Amino acid sequence: MALRCINNLEIFLRRCTAPTLHRCCVASSRTAHTASSSKGSGGDNSKDQENNGQNKSGYRRFGWRSVFQFCVPFSLGALVSAVLIEGHRDELTPTISARSLKGRRNEFNFIADVVAGCGDSVVYIEIKDTRHFDYFSGQPITASNGSGFVIEQNGLILTNAHVVINKPHTMVQVRLSDGRTFPATIEDVDQTSDLATLRIHVSGLPVMKLGKSSTLRSGEWVVALGSPLALSNTVTAGVISATQRASQELGLRNRDINYLQTDAAITFGNSGGPLVNLDGEAIGVNSMKVTAGISFAIPIDYVKVFLERAAERRKKGSAHKTGYPVKRYMGITMLTLTPDILFELKSRSQNMPNNLMHGVLVWKVIVGSPAHSGGLQPGDIVTHINKKEIKNSSDVYDALAEGRKDLEIVILRGVKQMHVKITPEDP
């Protein structure tokens, strides 16, 4: 700042010296000429020349003196001001600094803390088709997949029943979070509650803690862990939307369960995985998804009852390894369209027919299954089977139980009505 002021002062002096000096000299010359005229013109030329010399030296002294008398105080004042301003620049200029965000990651990363505490107990479940093999590897192809979690160190795993049963000519494999893979056997199944346990022959596994679903509140944070679309170790988060969603509201007439509803992102492959609270405890088993933001989990309190009964059967030596009834295999996971679910679907999609009042939503089709071969796709709505109106999932099971070789199915795909033919596999 001081250097800038000195430069400006030098420029000012250069500009003002010549014109100012010229004006001062002209003024002095005129004054001297007037004085000599008043004394008369009788003087000789030598005296006039002397006077003229004196006047010239006089106006020179008068011009430079005027310039420096004006400029020196000004320059000194400007220089002092510049020094003072430069020395107090920090005081004159307000300091604005961004608010420090350091430490926020550790303070608010509660989701990461949950995953770190219980994520190792979550497993990926694959159902291998023993009749079809990969061309390059020669290994059985994957017919379907799901999730589960370890509940005992000696290899007991909890999952959904629909993940592992009603799939003939298949075998079950479990992949742990560390990448190890083991064959698994089905120990206990409850198709009514859609729960099952698997066993792998390994010990010392990390175990998921089981919490209490009865203490949950709507709006409470939860974390869904699993393997959606075969992507292992996937984490999504959301809140509990409802704690008492009756199975009748979902069209599941053969079940007496009050489901947990959550908006945590859940999709195909999440089935059987844990829904965890912020204490790292499983408070539900992810079971089904209706649409984005609407998913359901089986409450862990209901699961505990199933596990207690299964433990009693194992003590008596009557575990259900093969004792569950095997139905004709179609290869879909479905959900009854209740009025509430229909309203939600219509509000979220413009492709839903306004006159649709009931039906069954196909939300998963197993690759290579009869349904897949027949042309069914996720999102299709089944309205009729063999010319009979379908109002809920029980009607589909009844159609399978009739034993007819082929099923003539009418579906809605968006707003378009279509016909497909499926030949279910016998057990």
UniProtKB/Swiss-Prot annotation:
Alphabetical list of InterPro entries matching this protein: PDZ, PDZ_6, PDZ_sf, Peptidase_S1_PA, Peptidase_S1C
Renumbered ranges of motif IAP-binding: 78-81
Family: Belongs to the peptidase S1C family.
Chain intervals for the UniProt region annotation (Serine protease): 144-307
Organism: Drosophila persimilis (Fruit fly)
GO function term, MF aspect, one: serine-type endopeptidase activity
Cellular component terms (Gene Ontology): mitochondrial intermembrane space; mitochondrial membrane
Residues annotated as catalytic: H162 (charge relay system), D194 (charge relay system), S271 (charge relay system)
High-level lineage: Eukaryota, Metazoa, Ecdysozoa, Arthropoda, Hexapoda
Chief localisation class: mitochondrion
Full protein name: Serine protease HTRA2, mitochondrial
Cited function: Serine protease that shows proteolytic activity against a non-specific substrate beta-casein. Promotes or induces cell death either by direct binding to and inhibition of BIRC proteins (also called inhibitor of apoptosis proteins, IAPs), leading to an increase in caspase activity, or by a BIRC inhibition-independent, caspase-independent and serine protease activity-dependent mechanism. Can antagonize antiapoptotic activity of th/Diap1 by directly inducing the degradation of th/Diap1.
Keyword DNA damage: no
Transmembrane portions of the chain: 67-87
One GO BP: positive regulation of apoptotic process
Protein's membrane topology: Single-pass membrane protein
Subunit structure: Interacts with th/DIAP1 (via BIR 2 domain).
EC number: 3.4.21.108
Keywords from the UniProt entry: Apoptosis, Hydrolase, Membrane, Mitochondrion, Protease, Serine protease, Transit peptide, Transmembrane, Transmembrane helix, Zymogen
Subcellular location: Mitochondrion intermembrane space; Mitochondrion membrane
SUPFAM superfamilies noted in UniProt: PDZ domain-like (SSF50156), Trypsin-like serine proteases (SSF50494)
Any one Pfam family match given in the protein's UniProt record, by short name: Trypsin_2
